[in-house]
């Protein structure tokens, strides 16, 4: 019997976890009042309460704008059944305009764990083995460059052309056109 509780940070849509339903007998979503981008260390008490309120032993932490695809759903279900470890690190792959961004290496975060092995203080961790899953959680950033520019125009201060070019050149470490477009737009603004 495969049962999973999803602890949601922010508003997580049902479509974000729908691929899990094909592999699980029961799926529960535990809503929290936590901000989507908050550090889990800073809200340990609230996270512990959410884990205690969950009905199932296996817990998945998902943030707003993140979603599980079919490959990750199958890997999560298989990992829960084999129980090779009590915790699983999962990378987050940001999507920009529908394509994956290549901005640095993400070692992953402990996002899937068995509640009885959760350490209740400090960094999020489990007592026992932690394994990194192959597939990643996907996170939507902006659906288009126009949406990205509009957001920055409202919430950030523009840079000069020279500063923008210098920032872009210092951060550009890829030849992926989608990632370069993202970095060029980001370099144009100073976010508060």
Which ranges hold each PLM region?
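N-proximal low-complexity "stem/linker" segments adjacent to membrane-targeting elements
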Residues: 1-32
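Local beta-strand N-terminus motif with an aromatic residue
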Residues: 2-4, 56, 85
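A generic local structural motif
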Residues: 17-20, 45-48, 74
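A short beta-strand-loop structural module common to alpha/beta enzyme folds
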Residues: 30-40
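Active-site nucleotide-sugar/metal-binding loop of Leloir-type enzymes
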Residues: 44-58
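Catalytic-site signature of metal-activated, phosphate-bearing donor transferases
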Residues: 48-51, 69-192
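Short beta-strand-to-loop acidic/aromatic patch adjacent to the donor-nucleotide binding site
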Residues: 56-67
